[in-house]
């Protein structure tokens, strides 16, 4: 089980990223617009840099929903490989069967 503080920190990063997503996308679209002068684009880059660091989506860590484990998390289920194997073995996950050949 991961530390509760790390899980909470990641949750706050998710919330902050969602709340400032529209502002960040608008600034980036203006920055990449070639019709705007270089000075204006540079000032927009500075505005983007002033946004909170934790509002960037790259700061969010994919964690297991059950244990909070940061590594080995499947995108499809949002669960770590260990817990996924355990749940599949018990037959809890619908549509997934253990392969044998």
Swiss-Prot record:
- Assigned GO CC terms: cytoplasm; small ribosomal subunit
GO MF, one term, reads: rRNA binding
A Gene Ontology annotation in the biological process aspect, one of them, is:
translation
Q: Which UniProt keywords apply?
A: Ribonucleoprotein, Ribosomal protein, RNA-binding, rRNA-binding
Superkingdom of this protein's organism: Bacteria
UniProt biased composition (Basic residues): 11-21
The record's annotation in SUPFAM superfamilies points to: Glucocorticoid receptor-like (DNA-binding domain)
Q: Which InterPro entries does the record associate with it?
A: Ribosomal_uS14, Ribosomal_uS14_bac/plastid, Ribosomal_uS14_CS
Please verify whether the record's keywords include Membrane: no
> Does the UniProt entry include the keyword Ribonucleoprotein?
yes
Which residues lie within the region annotated Disordered?
1-21
Which Pfam families has this protein been placed in?
Ribosomal_S14
Family of this protein? Belongs to the universal ribosomal protein uS14 family.
Q: How does it assemble?
A: Part of the 30S ribosomal subunit. Contacts proteins S3 and S10.
NCBIfam families per record: PRK08881.1
Relate the protein's function as given in its record: Binds 16S rRNA, required for the assembly of 30S particles and may also be responsible for determining the conformation of the 16S rRNA at the A site.
| Name under which the protein is recorded | Small ribosomal subunit protein uS14
Task: Give the species this sequence originates from.
Answer: Rickettsia canadensis (strain McKiel)
